[in-house]
């Protein structure tokens, strides 16, 4: 067996994501590939936008918490839309004579004032030439809950359901949902219209993040993001295409690596046998259980990426018991070039402990019990009675946890969240 030589050993520091991407795009694409696009290279227009947005927030933050939906729109959301180049090019849904809004999106977004003015008809607003739609809620209103509050225009309505209904009704591909602080993008092009979205916390961006991180708001929510180019596609369309292309590339890469991972695992289990013991029956056991171990590892990588295991909500779980932490430690070991033991089974013990925790669950760590049998020692006793030494297991996990990005010419953590959504 030969060690992999095609991967650049450099281990870049994983950059913090100043966005919440729920399967709409690829995290890796957003963090590593998008900054190489020419659209990312914005200058004074961006710095002016950020300065104006910060000034707007600072001037309104003390009163926003007490405003109702209509007041939030007038005092904050509409000024933000103006900063995003939508001034004079959006239609605001008006109230009926009874003072209640009809069931249409709050905003229809147009490429210019001429297109906007042509969209007023006797039957109502014509959305045919609209770039997209937007819906607004009062400051910090939960966007995934139905609730009744006097600050709401509509009572007991789930805003995320609402925006999807509006997108479907208007047949627009892109929609914005905001409570002033959180800004979300939804798309009819997503695999799951409701579950997949892209979210920015503008307060966090303005007060905690580097200035450049605000590009993740500016580039994605400004009017130019919805304007089609000569190819008929918008900036958001291209980001979605780039994310999908990366996901396909990654899926092919992981499938190819799986064969080599099984080879590592088979060699690892075989090492505990005498040559005379490697009978056809034992070799079949080794191969079958190497596949089971591969499935376990992939299951946990996917589960952690999708927050089915509490990585972001439980620090103890993340730092002491997760495959994320094991893989992170292994990446450092691999990059340092340290010799791996042919006797130690430290890492096998670590993953087996994690598998046991998943099988039984752990309320103290908020880990739910998995009763599908994959992690059951009764169904797979071989994996409890055998072990793989670090020399074989460490590179196997490294192959599943880090991947070479041909465009960046570096290795990065595998974006399993992207794979899990496709």
Regions found by a protein language model. Give the residues of each.
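Preference for the N-terminal adenyl/adenosyl cofactor-binding alpha/beta module
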Residues: 1-67, 138, 197-422
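Charge-rich, low-complexity amphipathic helices
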Residues: 98, 103, 188-189, 205, ...
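A short acidic (Asp/Glu
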Residues: 145, 185-190, 303, 311-313
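Loop/turn residues immediately N-terminal
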Residues: 181-183
